[in-house]
Protein backbone atom coordinates (compact mmCIF):
# COMPACT_ATOMS: atom_id res chain seq x y z
CA UNK A 1 0.00 0.00 0.00
CA UNK A 2 1.14 3.64 -0.29
CA UNK A 3 1.43 4.01 3.50
CA UNK A 4 3.41 2.18 6.16
CA UNK A 5 1.13 0.41 8.62
CA UNK A 6 -1.21 -1.49 6.26
CA UNK A 7 1.76 -2.90 4.33
CA UNK A 8 3.46 -3.99 7.53
CA UNK A 9 0.32 -5.69 8.78
CA UNK A 10 0.00 -7.59 5.49
CA UNK A 11 3.68 -8.62 5.42
CA UNK A 12 3.57 -9.96 8.96
CA UNK A 13 0.22 -11.72 8.79
CA UNK A 14 -0.15 -12.86 5.18
CA UNK A 15 -3.58 -11.17 5.14
CA UNK A 16 -4.95 -8.25 3.20
CA UNK A 17 -4.74 -5.10 5.34
CA UNK A 18 -8.52 -4.82 5.74
CA UNK A 19 -8.48 -8.18 7.54
CA UNK A 20 -5.90 -7.10 10.13
CA UNK A 21 -7.70 -4.44 10.52
CA UNK A 22 -4.92 -1.93 9.78
CA UNK A 23 -6.22 0.15 6.87
CA UNK A 24 -4.28 3.32 7.66
CA UNK A 25 -1.30 4.46 9.69
CA UNK A 26 -1.24 4.42 13.51
CA UNK A 27 -3.87 1.69 13.86
CA UNK A 28 -3.10 -1.18 16.22
CA UNK A 29 -2.68 -4.66 14.82
CA UNK A 30 -5.45 -6.93 16.10
CA UNK A 31 -4.40 -9.06 19.08
CA UNK A 32 -5.78 -12.16 17.36
CA UNK A 33 -3.42 -11.87 14.39
CA UNK A 34 -0.83 -14.66 14.19
CA UNK A 35 2.37 -13.45 12.54
CA UNK A 36 5.01 -15.55 10.83
CA UNK A 37 7.27 -14.81 13.81
CA UNK A 38 4.75 -16.35 16.19
CA UNK A 39 4.56 -19.48 14.04
CA UNK A 40 8.35 -19.79 14.07
CA UNK A 41 8.57 -19.03 17.80
CA UNK A 42 6.21 -21.92 18.50
CA UNK A 43 8.50 -24.15 16.44
CA UNK A 44 11.48 -23.33 18.64
CA UNK A 45 13.06 -20.49 16.67
CA UNK A 46 14.79 -17.64 18.46
CA UNK A 47 12.98 -14.54 17.22
CA UNK A 48 13.70 -10.84 17.39
CA UNK A 49 13.02 -7.46 15.84
CA UNK A 50 14.85 -4.16 15.58
CA UNK A 51 13.70 -0.89 14.06
CA UNK A 52 10.41 0.72 13.16
CA UNK A 53 7.26 -1.29 13.97
CA UNK A 54 4.33 1.09 13.32
CA UNK A 55 1.64 -1.37 14.40
CA UNK A 56 0.93 -0.29 17.97
CA UNK A 57 -1.03 2.92 17.60
CA UNK A 58 0.42 6.41 17.77
CA UNK A 59 3.16 5.97 20.41
CA UNK A 60 6.40 7.66 19.32
CA UNK A 61 9.07 6.39 19.61
CA UNK A 62 7.64 3.90 22.16
CA UNK A 63 10.45 1.38 22.59
CA UNK A 64 9.76 -2.35 23.03
CA UNK A 65 5.95 -2.42 22.70
CA UNK A 66 4.35 -4.82 25.17
CA UNK A 67 2.56 -6.77 22.44
CA UNK A 68 5.38 -8.70 20.76
CA UNK A 69 3.46 -10.73 18.14
CA UNK A 70 6.04 -13.51 18.25
CA UNK A 71 9.18 -11.36 18.30
CA UNK A 72 10.59 -12.48 21.65
CA UNK A 73 13.55 -10.10 21.68
CA UNK A 74 12.04 -6.74 20.77
CA UNK A 75 14.29 -4.52 22.89
CA UNK A 76 15.32 -2.49 19.85
CA UNK A 77 11.85 -2.23 18.31
CA UNK A 78 10.26 1.23 18.34
CA UNK A 79 6.75 1.97 17.26
CA UNK A 80 7.05 5.15 15.19
CA UNK A 81 9.46 7.71 13.79
CA UNK A 82 12.25 8.14 11.25
CA UNK A 83 15.01 8.79 13.73
CA UNK A 84 18.57 9.32 12.56
CA UNK A 85 20.69 8.73 15.64
CA UNK A 86 20.41 6.26 18.53
CA UNK A 87 22.31 5.52 21.71
CA UNK A 88 22.37 2.76 24.32
CA UNK A 89 21.82 3.83 27.93
CA UNK A 90 21.57 2.00 31.25
CA UNK A 91 17.80 2.30 30.85
CA UNK A 92 17.77 0.89 27.32
CA UNK A 93 17.97 2.40 23.85
CA UNK A 94 16.86 5.92 23.09
CA UNK A 95 16.85 8.53 20.36
CA UNK A 96 20.03 10.54 20.92
CA UNK A 97 19.23 14.03 19.52
CA UNK A 98 17.09 16.09 21.92
CA UNK A 99 15.40 19.42 21.49
CA UNK A 100 13.72 20.94 24.54
CA UNK A 101 14.08 17.54 26.19
CA UNK A 102 12.25 15.70 23.42
CA UNK A 103 13.65 13.43 20.67
CA UNK A 104 13.81 14.83 17.16
CA UNK A 105 15.12 13.84 13.73
CA UNK A 106 18.56 15.40 14.06
CA UNK A 107 21.59 13.79 12.43
CA UNK A 108 24.26 16.03 13.98
CA UNK A 109 27.32 14.09 15.12
CA UNK A 110 26.02 10.72 13.92
CA UNK A 111 28.77 8.25 13.00
CA UNK A 112 29.19 4.59 12.05
CA UNK A 113 28.12 3.52 15.54
CA UNK A 114 25.23 5.87 16.27
CA UNK A 115 23.61 6.55 12.88
CA UNK A 116 20.32 4.65 12.80
CA UNK A 117 21.15 2.31 9.91
CA UNK A 118 24.53 1.33 11.39
CA UNK A 119 23.20 1.08 14.94
CA UNK A 120 20.38 -1.24 13.93
CA UNK A 121 22.77 -3.38 11.89
CA UNK A 122 24.94 -3.85 14.98
CA UNK A 123 21.87 -5.20 16.80
CA UNK A 124 21.20 -7.66 13.97
CA UNK A 125 24.78 -8.92 14.02
CA UNK A 126 24.67 -9.26 17.80
CA UNK A 127 21.56 -11.43 17.55
CA UNK A 128 23.04 -13.53 14.75
CA UNK A 129 26.22 -14.15 16.73
CA UNK A 130 24.29 -15.00 19.90
CA UNK A 131 22.22 -17.60 18.06
CA UNK A 132 24.92 -19.27 16.01
CA UNK A 133 23.98 -22.88 15.36
CA UNK A 134 20.34 -22.35 16.35
CA UNK A 135 17.24 -21.78 14.24
CA UNK A 136 16.44 -18.07 14.31
CA UNK A 137 14.32 -15.39 12.67
CA UNK A 138 15.24 -11.74 12.98
CA UNK A 139 13.49 -8.83 11.32
CA UNK A 140 15.17 -5.44 11.00
CA UNK A 141 13.16 -2.46 9.81
CA UNK A 142 15.41 0.42 8.82
CA UNK A 143 13.77 3.86 8.85
CA UNK A 144 15.82 4.93 5.81
CA UNK A 145 15.57 5.71 2.98
CA UNK A 146 12.85 8.11 4.11
CA UNK A 147 12.47 11.78 4.79
CA UNK A 148 14.00 13.81 6.23
CA UNK A 149 16.64 13.29 3.55
CA UNK A 150 19.68 13.36 5.81
CA UNK A 151 22.49 10.86 6.27
CA UNK A 152 25.83 10.71 8.09
CA UNK A 153 29.23 11.40 6.55
CA UNK A 154 30.64 10.35 4.13
CA UNK A 155 27.33 9.39 2.54
CA UNK A 156 25.99 12.94 2.87
CA UNK A 157 28.37 14.20 0.15
CA UNK A 158 29.02 10.97 -1.76
CA UNK A 159 26.57 11.83 -4.54
CA UNK A 160 26.81 15.62 -4.38
CA UNK A 161 28.06 15.86 -7.97
CA UNK A 162 25.65 13.36 -9.49
CA UNK A 163 23.29 14.73 -12.12
CA UNK A 164 19.80 14.19 -10.72
CA UNK A 165 17.15 13.34 -13.35
CA UNK A 166 14.07 15.52 -12.98
CA UNK A 167 10.82 13.62 -13.62
CA UNK A 168 8.59 15.16 -16.29
CA UNK A 169 5.56 14.86 -14.01
CA UNK A 170 7.03 17.36 -11.53
CA UNK A 171 5.46 20.16 -13.58
CA UNK A 172 1.91 18.84 -13.51
CA UNK A 173 -0.67 21.55 -12.95
CA UNK A 174 -3.28 21.42 -10.20
CA UNK A 175 -5.86 20.59 -12.86
CA UNK A 176 -3.84 17.49 -13.81
CA UNK A 177 -3.61 16.30 -10.20
CA UNK A 178 -6.20 14.03 -8.51
CA UNK A 179 -8.44 15.94 -6.10
CA UNK A 180 -7.14 14.03 -3.06
CA UNK A 181 -3.60 15.23 -3.79
CA UNK A 182 -4.24 18.69 -5.23
CA UNK A 183 -3.76 20.53 -1.93
CA UNK A 184 -0.62 18.67 -0.88
CA UNK A 185 2.69 20.59 -0.79
CA UNK A 186 4.58 20.32 -4.08
CA UNK A 187 8.33 20.20 -4.63
CA UNK A 188 10.26 21.95 -7.37
CA UNK A 189 13.06 20.72 -9.60
CA UNK A 190 15.54 22.71 -7.49
CA UNK A 191 14.35 20.98 -4.32
CA UNK A 192 14.71 17.59 -5.98
CA UNK A 193 18.29 18.40 -6.98
CA UNK A 194 19.11 19.21 -3.36
CA UNK A 195 17.34 16.27 -1.70
CA UNK A 196 17.98 13.35 -4.04
CA UNK A 197 21.78 13.14 -3.55
CA UNK A 198 21.08 12.63 0.17
CA UNK A 199 18.48 10.00 -0.74
CA UNK A 200 21.10 8.18 -2.80
CA UNK A 201 23.41 8.41 0.20
CA UNK A 202 20.80 6.80 2.44
CA UNK A 203 20.42 3.94 -0.05
CA UNK A 204 24.20 3.44 -0.27
CA UNK A 205 24.52 3.39 3.52
CA UNK A 206 21.73 0.82 3.71
CA UNK A 207 23.35 -1.29 1.00
CA UNK A 208 26.68 -1.28 2.82
CA UNK A 209 25.01 -2.34 6.06
CA UNK A 210 23.11 -5.19 4.45
CA UNK A 211 26.54 -6.27 3.21
CA UNK A 212 27.73 -6.27 6.82
CA UNK A 213 24.93 -8.65 7.79
CA UNK A 214 25.79 -10.99 4.92
CA UNK A 215 29.45 -10.90 5.94
CA UNK A 216 28.55 -11.81 9.54
CA UNK A 217 26.43 -14.73 8.36
CA UNK A 218 29.21 -15.88 6.05
CA UNK A 219 31.81 -15.67 8.81
CA UNK A 220 29.63 -17.77 11.12
CA UNK A 221 28.98 -20.37 8.45
CA UNK A 222 25.27 -19.51 8.49
CA UNK A 223 24.83 -17.82 5.13
CA UNK A 224 23.96 -20.92 3.11
CA UNK A 225 21.41 -22.00 5.74
CA UNK A 226 19.69 -18.63 6.01
CA UNK A 227 16.77 -17.32 3.97
CA UNK A 228 17.12 -13.56 3.48
CA UNK A 229 14.10 -11.50 2.45
CA UNK A 230 14.71 -7.88 1.45
CA UNK A 231 11.54 -5.86 0.99
CA UNK A 232 9.85 -2.58 1.91
CA UNK A 233 6.54 -1.31 3.19
CA UNK A 234 6.27 1.25 0.35
CA UNK A 235 8.33 3.41 -1.96
CA UNK A 236 9.07 7.11 -2.30
CA UNK A 237 7.89 9.34 -5.14
CA UNK A 238 11.30 11.07 -5.34
CA UNK A 239 9.77 14.12 -6.98
CA UNK A 240 7.34 12.36 -9.31
CA UNK A 241 4.10 14.34 -9.58
CA UNK A 242 5.72 17.08 -7.52
CA UNK A 243 5.75 14.96 -4.37
CA UNK A 244 8.29 13.21 -2.21
CA UNK A 245 6.12 11.06 0.06
Identify the function of each model-found stretch.
Residues 1-245:
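Formylglycine-dependent sulfatase
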Amino acid sequence: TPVCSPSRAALLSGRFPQHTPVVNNNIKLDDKIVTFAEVLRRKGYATGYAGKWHLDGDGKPQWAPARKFGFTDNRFMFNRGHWKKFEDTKNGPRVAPRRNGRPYYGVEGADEKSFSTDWLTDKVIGFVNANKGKPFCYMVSYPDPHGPNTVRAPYDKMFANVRVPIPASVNKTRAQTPAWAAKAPRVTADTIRVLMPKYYGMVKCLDDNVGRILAALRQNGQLEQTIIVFTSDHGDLCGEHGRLN
